[in-house]
Amino acid sequence: MRGTIMKGIGGFYYVNTDRGIIECRARGKFRYNGLFPMVGDKVEIKLERDQGIIDEICPRISQLKRPAVANVTQALVVFAFNHPEINEDLLNKFLISCEFNNLKPIVCFNKLDLADKEKKLDVIDMIRNTGYEVIFLKAKEGYGIDKVREKLKDNITVLCGPSGVGKSTILNAIYGKELMETGQISHKLNRGKHTTRHSEIIELEDGFMVDTPGFSSLDIGHITKDKLQYCFPEFIEFIGICKFTGCVHHKEPDCAVKSALYDDKINKRRYDFYVKTLNEISSKKKY
């Protein structure tokens, strides 16, 4: 029997099949082989003593490490302009993760009414200079929600971003009812409580949405130095025309990417983040 994992909690996986949702466990062979079922996986299951058993995980068309989801077609990367304060490094890490996994990211800035004007323009310029689509939201008031709905049609969309930015509020506005519990910002840490504690596929009218827990940090250390450059779409047209083969666009002379930076074809803040990430990858490799 084939189905799709809709959510996973405490070692149990809830698989949507022709017979409805079946609670399943995974066979031990997956753990032995270092393979773990993910929300979004297409799986073959068997019934043994009234217990569903995941017997096979079908090949994935896409996969995110964190949040751990499979077979999604695009990502809504949600950040708030304030409460919590926007973390540009974390935003860029989410975008890198999407690019590395061949997912189309759409950047949603929520809480537009709380934005500092100068900061808003800087962040918008940084993202738009890369060619990413940007949607502005005031989710509590419903502003911008129709634009999000348009993007969901015929897609399996992962909703991701840090805690407290309003992902559950956005999902409730899209769905039209209080589907997910919404949390308040933790005053002690000025970060959002992790209201969503597990990833789950939500079926919508024209598509599917994967709601995921919020994160205050994101590790992209699995991306190698030579692959990192391809996670910056604004670099692509300049890669391969540098003087030196294997140029990583940092200290090498006659670098086409750095020339584009000097000509204002690449955003300096994005390039600075690239160099910072490149150095972090190099430092990890030494140990």
From Swiss-Prot:
<dbReference type="InterPro" id="IPR027417">
    <property type="entry name" value="P-loop_NTPase"/>
</dbReference>
<dbReference type="GO" id="GO:0019843">
    <property type="term" value="F:rRNA binding"/>
</dbReference>
<comment type="similarity">
    <text>Belongs to the TRAFAC class YlqF/YawG GTPase family. RsgA subfamily.</text>
</comment>
<feature type="binding site">
    <location>
        <begin position="110"/>
        <end position="113"/>
    </location>
    <ligand>
        <name>GTP</name>
    </ligand>
</feature>
<feature type="binding site">
    <location>
        <begin position="161"/>
        <end position="169"/>
    </location>
    <ligand>
        <name>GTP</name>
    </ligand>
</feature>
<dbReference type="InterPro" id="IPR012340">
    <property type="entry name" value="NA-bd_OB-fold"/>
</dbReference>
<keyword id="KW-0963">Cytoplasm</keyword>
<comment type="subunit">
    <text>Monomer. Associates with 30S ribosomal subunit, binds 16S rRNA.</text>
</comment>
<comment type="function">
    <text>One of several proteins that assist in the late maturation steps of the functional core of the 30S ribosomal subunit. Helps release RbfA from mature subunits. May play a role in the assembly of ribosomal proteins into the subunit. Circularly permuted GTPase that catalyzes slow GTP hydrolysis, GTPase activity is stimulated by the 30S ribosomal subunit.</text>
</comment>
<dbReference type="GO" id="GO:0003924">
    <property type="term" value="F:GTPase activity"/>
</dbReference>
<feature type="binding site">
    <location>
        <position position="242"/>
    </location>
    <ligand>
        <name>Zn(2+)</name>
    </ligand>
</feature>
<keyword id="KW-0862">Zinc</keyword>
<feature type="binding site">
    <location>
        <position position="247"/>
    </location>
    <ligand>
        <name>Zn(2+)</name>
    </ligand>
</feature>
<dbReference type="GO" id="GO:0046872">
    <property type="term" value="F:metal ion binding"/>
</dbReference>
<keyword id="KW-0378">Hydrolase</keyword>
<feature type="domain" description="CP-type G">
    <location>
        <begin position="61"/>
        <end position="218"/>
    </location>
</feature>
<keyword id="KW-0342">GTP-binding</keyword>
<keyword id="KW-0547">Nucleotide-binding</keyword>
<dbReference type="GO" id="GO:0005737">
    <property type="term" value="C:cytoplasm"/>
</dbReference>
<feature type="binding site">
    <location>
        <position position="249"/>
    </location>
    <ligand>
        <name>Zn(2+)</name>
    </ligand>
</feature>
<keyword id="KW-0694">RNA-binding</keyword>
<keyword id="KW-0690">Ribosome biogenesis</keyword>
<protein>
    <recommendedName>
        <fullName>Small ribosomal subunit biogenesis GTPase RsgA</fullName>
        <ecNumber>3.6.1.-</ecNumber>
    </recommendedName>
</protein>
<dbReference type="InterPro" id="IPR030378">
    <property type="entry name" value="G_CP_dom"/>
</dbReference>
<keyword id="KW-0479">Metal-binding</keyword>
<keyword id="KW-0699">rRNA-binding</keyword>
<dbReference type="InterPro" id="IPR031944">
    <property type="entry name" value="RsgA_N"/>
</dbReference>
<dbReference type="InterPro" id="IPR004881">
    <property type="entry name" value="Ribosome_biogen_GTPase_RsgA"/>
</dbReference>
<feature type="binding site">
    <location>
        <position position="255"/>
    </location>
    <ligand>
        <name>Zn(2+)</name>
    </ligand>
</feature>
<dbReference type="Pfam" id="PF16745">
    <property type="entry name" value="RsgA_N"/>
</dbReference>
<dbReference type="InterPro" id="IPR010914">
    <property type="entry name" value="RsgA_GTPase_dom"/>
</dbReference>
<dbReference type="GO" id="GO:0005525">
    <property type="term" value="F:GTP binding"/>
</dbReference>
<dbReference type="Pfam" id="PF03193">
    <property type="entry name" value="RsgA_GTPase"/>
</dbReference>
<dbReference type="GO" id="GO:0042274">
    <property type="term" value="P:ribosomal small subunit biogenesis"/>
</dbReference>
